[in-house]
Amino acid sequence: MKEIFLQISNRQDLSQDQVQAVFDRILKNEVSESQIASFLMGLKIKGETSDEITGIVRALKSHATVLPETFTDAMCNCGTGGDQSYSFNISTTACFVLAAGGIRMAKAGNRSISSKSGSADVLEVLGINVAASPEILSKALDEVGLAFIFAQTMHPAMRFIGPARQALGIPTIMNLVGPLANPLDLETQLMGLYRVELQEIVANTIQQLGRKRAVIITGPDNMDEAALYGTNTYTLLEDGHISQHTFTYEDLGMEKVELSDITGGDAKENAEILLSVLRNEASPYLETTVLNVGLGFFANGKAGTIKEGVELARQLIADGSALEKLRKLQEVQV
């Protein structure tokens, strides 16, 4: 590790092979917690590159648990977290609506690292087994069209990184890697990103990983979700081309919702918010959800525009389809 630390301290980027070799050692528990923390902090200070992110993703996928069935049409809408917005679990709520729209959702997630409640914490309150076996996950993806992919189950060696991440308590390259290291080879992706300046780097990584189409979204104040105030910036990967765009709530004909209106709470409180949205109860939470679902339908290609996606999201919530997806997942992912 000494040579690696020297290179990082000189602000020299690492190659994919170098990073993959380091993470192979980390995932075999051959690197101390203090060294892992130093490595993550060093990359953050230096600035992460596409090659470094890809190297970690490759290492994680090579150590990941494999599902017994192969799915080639799946999507994930997991974000990086780490935006310090303390909003409710937007992408977790949105995934049920996206699944109701006919998209096979392999929703990755974890327990809370830097917020009150991670997606795993909320789903656990709702009776979903976040530590379900690969066989059950395959069944859920097949029968429900939706499964929650718990990082600690599919990436058991991640337990060697967790303590260092918890000790640092700030976003690191692992926040970027998490949504990209889905054990399934995703066809499409919506990824929330807490730093707008990293969008192009992440888009290049996603392209290297073979995604057909993807959107990387950063909301106002560097939220890792789209929001109904200020300007949202997204990078679109489509047909091998990468382009950046912006939009506001006004562009979509929607009402303004301040960040303070979508604050979440602990896992139990966020589970109640999720249920209220899927029951179509009018609120800022509902409006923010349909915005992000609309963006998800656009990212997948199911909607030609974000506005069309928002309209589809409203229909799927209003007719109970999204709530039914939750009920079915509660029956299968147990």
Swiss-Prot record:
Q: Binding of anthranilate 2: at which residues? A: R165
Which amino acid positions bind Mg(2+) 2, per UniProt? D224, E225
Positions that bind Mg(2+) 1: S91, E225
Q: Which Pfam families match?
A: Glycos_trans_3N (PF02885), Glycos_transf_3 (PF00591)
Necessary cofactors: Mg(2+)
- Database matches in InterPro entries: Anthranilate_Pribosyl_Tfrase, Glycosyl_Trfase_fam3, Glycosyl_Trfase_fam3_N_dom, Glycosyl_Trfase_fam3_N_dom_sf, Nuc_phospho_transferase
Class of the enzyme per the UniProt entry, highest EC level: transferase
Q: Is Amino-acid biosynthesis found in the keyword set?
A: yes
**Entry's transmembrane regions:** none
Residues recorded as binding 5-phospho-alpha-D-ribose 1-diphosphate, renumbered to this chain, are: 79, 82-83, 87, 89-92, 107-115, 119
Question: What are the GO cellular component annotations?
Answer: cytosol
Query: Domain of life here?
Result: Bacteria
Instruction: Give the metabolic or biological pathway.
Output: Amino-acid biosynthesis; L-tryptophan biosynthesis; L-tryptophan from chorismate: step 2/5
Q: Name one process (GO BP) from the record.
A: L-tryptophan biosynthetic process
Cofactor detail note: Binds 2 magnesium ions per monomer.
Q: A Gene Ontology MF term for this entry?
A: anthranilate phosphoribosyltransferase activity
Function according to Swiss-Prot or TrEMBL: Catalyzes the transfer of the phosphoribosyl group of 5-phosphorylribose-1-pyrophosphate (PRPP) to anthranilate to yield N-(5'-phosphoribosyl)-anthranilate (PRA).
Q: Which NCBIfam families match?
A: trpD
Under the subunit heading, UniProt states:
Homodimer.
What protein is this chain from? Anthranilate phosphoribosyltransferase
Q: Which organism is it from?
A: Streptococcus thermophilus (strain CNRZ 1066)
List the gene name: trpD
